[in-house]
Amino acid sequence: MSTYPIYLRPELAPIIAETPEQTTWDLPAMRAGGDALLANPHEADNRVEVSARGRTFIPADLAEDAPLIISIHGGGYVAGRAAFDDAKNDELATRFGAIVVSPEYRLAPEFPFPIPVDDCISALAEALERFGHERPTFILGDSAGAGLAYSMVSRLCGLGLQMAQDEAIAARYKRIASLIRGIILLEPCVDPTLSTPSSRFFAEGPVWTRRAAAGAWRHYFGVPLDAEVTIPLRLIEAAFPKPSAEFREEGFPPALIVVNPVDPLRDEGIALATGLVDAGCIAEMHMFAGTFHGSLSMPGSVTWHEIQLLIDRFVKENSAVR
């Protein structure tokens, strides 16, 4: 991190001390540290259905036109559980009267790309079949969850270097893509090259570091940590296609992107937002003073309230559009 003072919001400072070190080079330790945070589980206000596939929050007074939100947790593609986001997802279900589905996607390196993306697509497809295809549908992700959100929507739209699939699956994916009204990306983790200025300037974090990112990306793409090889470009292009005119032509949905000023991932989120705009897509980007990686959805914080206001307006605007 920089050697001179960087402003951080005082209300968010406790997160830095409370977050276990993100040791992507020692996954058992990283995962155990995360699991320890579940010692005091959240008591939900809404009905929660739990299965091996994920967690679903359903308001008691569910309206016929209530939105469906697929909320994808973070964890560097290698850690995390759907339960980690219970407080956030419960609050989203209450605020928007929405069905919130949090996929329990499989983690790398045991299940590298594209398996986690496929799991998230399956969760969306199952939710649409169960709750109806007419509901305004949004995809929300945080950090690696935002990367998965971007990957799954790109794949559904048939963008970038696609994995092999038959015509029936491609047609099914296009139908699903047409139902997505918007994509919400919080502090997106979408650039495995680690080549941005912010990835160097904030190499020591706080919370997420350049070393952690390097390990996470190798795990995600099935490259051994100690291998003297780079991640194959074809895999990067398949996972995170660069915005182009094809995005607009294929109907990539409106995007709401939030980045942190103090975050090694900051510049890749900015590049994604401007890339979408330059490609002719609808995109907006926000950056709040003093936020850092992992701080956007701290329960009860002013920051999380501000983020919810953004999401509220974005969901309302795009729910009314067909």
Where are these regions (language model features)?
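A fold-wide structural signal in alpha/beta-hydrolase
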Residues: L68, G97-V101
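Catalytic nucleophile-loop/oxyanion-hole region of alpha/beta-hydrolase
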Residues: R81-A82, K88, S102-P136, P299-H305
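Gly/Ala-rich beta-loop-alpha elbow adjacent to hydrolase catalytic centers
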Residues: G141, G145, A149
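Short beta-strand element of the alpha/beta-hydrolase
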Residues: D65-G75
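Alpha/beta hydrolase fold serine-hydrolase catalytic domain that processes acyl esters and thioesters
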Residues: D26, G33, L37, R135, ...
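Short beta-strand-to-loop junctions in surface cap/lid or active-site-entrance loops
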Residues: R53-D65, F240-R248
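Active-site glycine-rich loops that stabilize anionic/oxyanionic intermediates
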Residues: H73-V78, V262
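A glycine/proline-hinged amphipathic helix-loop "lid/cap" segment
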Residues: M1-D61, D226-V229, S319-V321
